[in-house]
Amino acid sequence: MSDIHFKKHRVFRETEDVIFYDISVEESNASDLVVHTGAAISPPDDCVGAKSFYIHGFQDDYNRVVSGERTFELVNTTWRYPYHIVRLDVHSGALIIPRGTFHRSQSGENGSIVINLSLIHI
């Protein structure tokens, strides 16, 4: 079984040229919208050009691309294969990034918009 998991969306209604998606994450207790206006890297490289990563000790992320494309770089030493590169677009579902996972992302040339419906463990 893979270390990489997705929370898929559900189509609940379709009309001419319109699709309604349920993108709920029942576990979520926080949300943020992250907009990259170009091929941004988040977090940016440090002052000498070395890669920087986010890591959350008390938060699981559910990152869903709603516009554009974004590539995530994930490192988790508890996984069988600790290093992954995952490319997301609007059809991918929400990439689940468990707490304790180092992660960073880069948007495609035209940028991207991601909604993160996270679970903060308090």
Question: What feature does the model see in each segment?
Answer:
Residues 93-105:
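Histidine-centered metal-chelating micro-motifs
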Residues 1-52:
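A short, N-terminal "cap"/entry segment at the start of jelly-roll beta-barrel domains
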Residues 57-72, 76:
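Short, conserved beta-strand element in jelly-roll/cupin
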Residues 120-122:
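Conserved small/polar residues in nucleotide/adenosyl-binding loops
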Residues 46-57, 79-82, 99:
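Short acidic (Asp/Glu) patches
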Residues 72-73, 103-108, 116:
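Short beta-strand His + acidic residue motifs that chelate non-heme Fe in jelly-roll/DSBH
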Residues 78-96:
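Short acidic-glycine-tyrosine-enriched beta hairpin
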